[in-house]
């Protein structure tokens, strides 16, 4: 059973700091002069400026705040919608927008407001607008270590709690587990829906990414897919009409597009969405393919983008493509082949070239994007040699740079045709 405590153990200094020294600050009598002195001192230190930055000490006391207040904080600290490989900062959103994007119930938010205005007054957080804009920003202004320390303090209090609202506690622990996982890097994160926005494409592309594991790298969208998708969207009309020499109209045969090793399907779905904008859905058939364990999620992404009428997610094993051929035919029939980041083992260059040779039509074009990882420099050279030996010609190359979840990466694009 997963225990988030295994991920992080704050040192004694951090835990003490995150308790806000409440044992010293909290008066025994709520009406005593000691409390008045505390609030007066806090008031003098706080600014009336709505832009005043808050810090971890402004988070509700784990010791004294009710679970509804802690739950609301955890929901507000949920990451914003991920666009490409970045997060929206959450600045200047309305209360309604924050509630909608975070799935936050208004009554829960009002409970947090009561905490900051009546139970533990804080001028920096004494309105719904301040709460909704400042609390989410703590993910960017407070260190991960301090946030993890706060989360751990919450876990210690509520993991074995009893006598409290069981439904609230279960929801709190669920949100808490997600916040801890999100704070520990991409490989520890739960499943997410990431949105991709491309120039010259009128709609964003939602893609579901399950939790990433070492043996299922296809569950993640890699940077090379974004680079190739942008190229496709920017130049689809040129790439298609110049190299395949046909247009999508009622007088032309059906055009067939194949994405190999599609993963989450970004490249194939980008092609499909741009094609739909330009020409509609007539005379086009698109296959996004991968291994069996990847295709289930791939089907979900086709559905998320409402492309099921002309895009099929299917199994295509590069070591045994006969099942795909027996089911659909199409050997040497694809006008366009799309491949992004296919080289991450010594066997892949041969498999990739075999698939291009087997499925590319005589007048077709393959668009290949590969990251220039030092670890696979030898495999890239083998790929280049095998392309020449297989009567395939690189007619265009271009270098580019981009980013993914692990930082900046350099990429190489190749446009490939038959000799």
Swiss-Prot record:
A GO term for molecular function: protein methyltransferase activity
Summary of the function given for this chain in its UniProt record: S-adenosyl-L-methionine-dependent protein-lysine N-methyltransferase that mono- and dimethylates elongation factor 2 (EFT1/EFT2) at 'Lys-613' and methylates elongation factor 3A (YEF3).
**Entry keyword Iron-sulfur:** no
Q: Which GO terms describe its cellular component?
A: cytoplasm
Q: Which domain of life is it from?
A: Eukaryota
* EC nos: 2.1.1.-
In its keyword annotation, does this UniProt entry include S-adenosyl-L-methionine?
A: yes
Q: Identify the Pfam families for this entry.
A: Methyltransf_16
Q: Which family does it belong to?
A: Belongs to the class I-like SAM-binding methyltransferase superfamily. METTL21 family.
Q: Where does S-adenosyl-L-methionine bind?
A: 222, 261-263, 290, 318, 340
Keywords tagged on the record: Cytoplasm, Methyltransferase, S-adenosyl-L-methionine, Transferase
This chain's protein is named Protein-lysine N-methyltransferase EFM2
Q: What are the GO BP annotations of this UniProt entry?
A: methylation; positive regulation of translational termination
Q: Where in the cell is it found?
A: Cytoplasm
Task: Enumerate the PANTHER family for this protein.
Answer: HEPATOCELLULAR CARCINOMA-ASSOCIATED ANTIGEN (PTHR14614), PROTEIN-LYSINE N-METHYLTRANSFERASE EFM2 (PTHR14614:SF156)
Q: Which enzyme class?
A: transferase
Matching entries from Gene3D superfamilies are given as:
Vaccinia Virus protein VP39 (3.40.50.150)
Q: Further remark, if any?
A: Present with 217 molecules/cell in log phase SD medium.
Report, from the record, the phenotype seen after gene disruption. Answer: Increases sensitivity to antibiotics that target translation and decreases translational fidelity.
């Amino acid at each position: 059973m997963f225990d988030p405590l295994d991920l992080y153990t704050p040192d004694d200094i951090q835990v003490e700091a995150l308790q806000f020294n409440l044992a010293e600050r909290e008066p025994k009598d709520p009406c005593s002069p000691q409390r008045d002195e505390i609030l007066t001192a806090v008031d003098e230190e706080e600014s009336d400026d709505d832009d005043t930055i808050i810090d971890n000490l402004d988070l509700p006391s784990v010791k004294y705040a009710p679970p509804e207040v802690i739950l609301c904080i955890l929901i507000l600290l949920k990451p914003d919608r991920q666009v490409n490989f970045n997060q929206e900062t959450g600045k200047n959103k309305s209360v309604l927008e924050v509630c909608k994007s975070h799935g936050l119930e208004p009554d829960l938010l009002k409970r947090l407001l009561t905490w900051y205005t009546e139970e533990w007054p804080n001028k920096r957080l004494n309105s719904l607008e301040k709460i909704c804009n400042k609390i989410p920003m703590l993910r960017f202004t407070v260190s991960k270590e301090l946030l993890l320390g706060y989360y751990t303090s919450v876990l210690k209090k509520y993991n074995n709690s009893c006598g409290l609202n069981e439904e609230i506690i279960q929801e709190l622990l669920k949100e808490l587990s997600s916040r801890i996982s999100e704070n520990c890097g991409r490989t520890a994160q739960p499943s997410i829906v990431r949105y991709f926005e491309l120039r010259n494409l009128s709609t964003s592309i939602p893609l579901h990414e399950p939790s990433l594991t070492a043996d299922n790298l296809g569950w993640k969208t890699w940077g090379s897919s974004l680079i190739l998708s942008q190229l496709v969207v920017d130049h689809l009309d040129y790439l298609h009409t110049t190299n395949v020499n046909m247009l999508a109209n009622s007088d032309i045969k059906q055009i067939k597009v194949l994405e190999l090793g599609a993963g989450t399907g970004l490249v194939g779905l980008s092609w499909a969405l741009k094609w739909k904008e330009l020409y509609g859905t007539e005379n086009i058939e698109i296959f996004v393919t991968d291994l069996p364990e990847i295709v289930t999620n791939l089907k979900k992404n086709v559905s998320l983008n409402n492309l099921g009428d002309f895009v099929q997610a299917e199994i295509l094993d590069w070591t045994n493509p006969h099942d795909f051929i027996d089911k659909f035919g199409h050997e040497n029939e694809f006008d366009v082949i799309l491949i992004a980041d296919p080289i991450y083992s010594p066997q892949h260059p041969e498999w990739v070239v075999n698939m291009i040779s087997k499925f590319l039509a005589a007048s077709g074009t393959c668009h290949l994007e590969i990251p220039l990882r030092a670890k696979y420099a030898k495999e890239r050279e083998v790929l280049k040699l095998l392309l020449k030996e297989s009567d395939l010609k690189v007619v265009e190359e271009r270098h580019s740079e981009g980013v993914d979840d692990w930082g900046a990466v350099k990429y190489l694009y190749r446009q490939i045709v038959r000799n």
